[in-house]
Amino acid sequence: MENNFIDYRSFVGMNPEKFYKATLAQSERLMLGLNCLESGQEQKVHDHSGQDKFYFVLEGEGLFTVGDEVKVAGIGMLVWAPATIPHGVKNQTAQRLVILMGIAPAP
């Protein structure tokens, strides 16, 4: 049986080598994940040819790139990256950055 009520805090983790990822929920149509970036870690700019993606900041703040735009987003902010648009994020603060990430259709 699937868990339809998920507390993201039980999935928060860290990896000293690269940013930490955990899958919260997945179907054929959507994947929701948690990305945790320690100070100095980044998800390099990349794109998805047939998938839209969003980031929602749960904790901390990050420097997000979407296309030609580069902006800081903090708690409660949504960052939208349509298919084919290059996107990425870097944690330039001393605090952990925790992001809810969604991608559709699921990989």
Regions found by a protein language model. Give the residues of each.
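A short, N-terminal "cap"/entry segment at the start of jelly-roll beta-barrel domains
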Residues: 1-30, 44
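Conserved short histidine dyad/triad with adjacent acidic residue
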Residues: 18, 33-48
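A generic "binding-loop/recognition-motif" signal
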Residues: 30, 50, 69, 85, ...
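Well-ordered beta-strand scaffold positions
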Residues: 30, 35, 61, 69-71
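Short, conserved beta-strand element in jelly-roll/cupin
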Residues: 36-37, 49-64
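Histidine-centered metal-chelating micro-motifs
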Residues: 42-44, 63, 79, 83-89
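Short acidic-glycine-tyrosine-enriched beta hairpin
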Residues: 69-83
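Ligand-binding loop in jelly-roll beta-barrel domains
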Residues: 83-107
